[in-house]
Amino acid sequence: MAISKVWISLLLALAVVLSAPAARAEEAAAAEEAAAAPEAVLTLHADNFDDAIAKHPFILVEFYAPWCGHCKSLAPEYEKAAQLLSKHDPAIVLAKVDANDEKNKPLAGKYEVQGFPTLKIFRSGGKNIQEYKGPREAEGIVEYLKKQVGPASKEIKAPEDATYLEDGKIHIVGVFTEFSGTEFTNFLELAEKLRSDYDFGHTVHANHLPRGDAAVERPLVRLFKPFDELVVDSKDFDVSALEKFIDASSTPKVVTFDKNPDNHPYLLKYFQSNAPKAMLFLNFSTGPFESFKSAYYGAVEEFSGKDVKFLIGDIEASQGAFQYNGLKEDQAPLILIQDSDSKKFLKEQVEAGQIVAWLKDYFDGKLTPFRKSEPIPEANNEPVKVVVADNIHDVVFKSAKNVLIEFYAPWCGHCKKLAPILDEAAATLQSEEDVVIAKIDATANDVPGEFDVQGYPTLYFVTPSGKKVSYEGGRTADEIVDYIKKNKETAGQAAAAATEKAAEPAATEPLKDEL
């Protein structure tokens, strides 16, 4: 199941400010000259991409589409950053790929580009690829990349080297007897892998660390965090085990959804997680809040062994979540669970004393899923058909037709521009009885787990046999019509595909002994 990344759009309403250090005087001066300088961003394409990745030990690549508004906004900042970094030692190279160009689409597929702009850091000839998670303005890009190009883990030689560990952020430190051996090698490997997410350090002096103990049994990995236990240790140096330890330890046991900007990084991590999510929403400013909080935290401890992440949200700060899930304030206090299959379970007007029992019913599989859906339209006569959550599977997967479906938001400017184009394409194809162009308001309806909707508009093309492809083609009516005509299945092709699919289980099912 793909991550339900629409959840992340809930956080766009938050005032998430990615702060960056002020530009140095020489960088500011260089920025003033940027407009007159030659383009510093490399233009890559299918023919030169591999050579460029192999040539540059460190390169940031932007996958963009010419029609993408966010890409257009990023372009001048990206170019300015490239010029500011052009003389950096070691070299920091910025490049771009038009992922909408037909010949470059295999590159976009290879590197799992699912939205625009997508930025990825390529290190060591492409052996290490990471998502870029830094700011989107020039000075912020520069400072972030300078940090990324240095060592993945810094040695802590003296107490003053460790003062940064108390800055209220998450830090990971490896404590060793010597900087060699399997444990140290594995630690550095993980630091390189996760360097875009966390700061790593290493030392042979445990007493240099805050709350340190010179007698600590080494080697170990110590994670510093500004919540819960404040310090947690692990002695398992298997890379996979270490990664799981860091992931589990770097988010509060209960994430708080309020207006405090210090909580925003944890919210992003929470909503990006694949794990089931339990969310209690209520008014933080009313009297019962403390009793609910106490009961909820008690439930979290009781179910601590379960694979679920917990959140408590203030109604005032959580309006995006309410709108996304089709909830109303008069339903609060409420608990909402979204599981790994995108199914949702709702308990409205919950009482503090009911929280544990309701969660137990969820874990025991006794609850009925809740689905947000607009009513199925009584009349649906326009060229572009309106689809809702309650009938999307019937229209898209069970209609035996070729369906181009748009996931849109009513407030989205790009969606508004696309609407008349889809109308024109649908009108052109009205005589094609095996073709449907449809749309669904993804803010008013739950998006099925089969679709990965990261932004608006998102379009998918689904054939009668069930083949599902993210549409990344042109945005004119003619281009859409041409794409559908070239890629649609005939009744015969769909039947053949269905027959082949039906035969697969029999061909692959292992022989079983029957008693």
UniProtKB/Swiss-Prot annotation:
Q: Motif Prevents secretion from ER in this chain: where?
A: 512-515
Q: Tell me the GO molecular function terms.
A: protein disulfide isomerase activity
Active site positions: 68, 71, 412, 415
* Thioredoxin domain mapped to chain residues: 26-150, 346-489
Q: Which Pfam families match?
A: Thioredoxin (PF00085), Thioredoxin_6 (PF13848)
In terms of Gene3D superfamilies, this protein maps to: Glutaredoxin (3.40.30.10)
Q: What is this protein called?
A: Protein disulfide-isomerase
Annotated organism of origin: Triticum aestivum (Wheat)
Gene field: PDI
